[in-house]
Amino acid sequence: MANNAVLRIFTHYFEANRIIMDSVKIIEIKKSVFEDNNLDADALRKELKAKGVFLLNLMSSPGSGKTTTLIQTINRIKDKIRVAVMEADIDSDVDAVKIKEATGIPSIQLHTGGMCHLDAEMTRQGLDNMPMEDVDLVILENVGNLVCPAEFDTGSSCNAMILSVPEGHDKPLKYPLMFSICDVVVVNKIDVLPYFDFDMDKCREYVHMRNPKARVIPISAKTGEGVDEFASWLMEAVNDWKKR
């Protein structure tokens, strides 16, 4: 069945630290949900590799702290690598503006027209509106959802996810797919561990049941605890990818 979606791209251009908001570009997307997505994703991955651009697909449920984690992480690495961000949401440009104001890096907002994920073609359309010749690392903050984003290959070089303490340590058992495809699981909001029945050891155990190779990194995006480890992991991932 054809699935109609609208991907609206808010492009922010940066000149002398000023934001010039371009007019909204509206692109109609009409395709079957899974039609050729894996082929599209593989093709996009090869193109990005040829350009030397690493694409990180960051997933999580809503409210897990993706944007705050990105701000903390980007501010630790932006002097070492050229970074840009694509923010995917059903509506609003709040996160893209927040990223720009807090980090000063290029960011665009993708509106999915009600869809709960991005696929490879939608990701490509976002990348087409980015200054790719001036970027080494693009971080895609996918739509907040623990199910749909994991089902669609975006063409990323690497998948990451954030699990927050209030969500519970049993999420890897309930939502196995996302945990099984991620190279790293960031456990955010460890500053509130005393107030929740969250067992970090159980969380690690359950993550590794789904994905023995996944790295588990506890952090607090609010206090900054553990963010250095995630930033180091990301830089290592990019450098290792460049050598392959």
Model regions and ranges:
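Nucleotide-state-sensitive switch-loop elements of NTP-binding domains
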Residues: 23-46, 51-59, 64, 68, ...
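Conserved strand-to-helix beginnings and helix N-cap segments that scaffold or border functional pockets
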Residues: 67, 96, 120-121, 172, ...
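Canonical P-loop GTPase G-domain recognition
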Residues: 192-244
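Conserved C-terminal guanine-recognition region of P-loop GTPase G domains, centered on the G4
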Residues: 149-156, 165-213
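Short, Lys/Arg-enriched N-terminal segments with co-localized hydrophobic residues
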Residues: 3-20
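Active-site glycine-centered loops adjacent to acidic/histidine catalytic or metal-binding residues
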Residues: 89, 188, 220
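Conserved beta-strand segments of the P-loop GTPase G domain that flank and frequently precede/overlap
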Residues: 58, 110-111, 161-164, 186-189
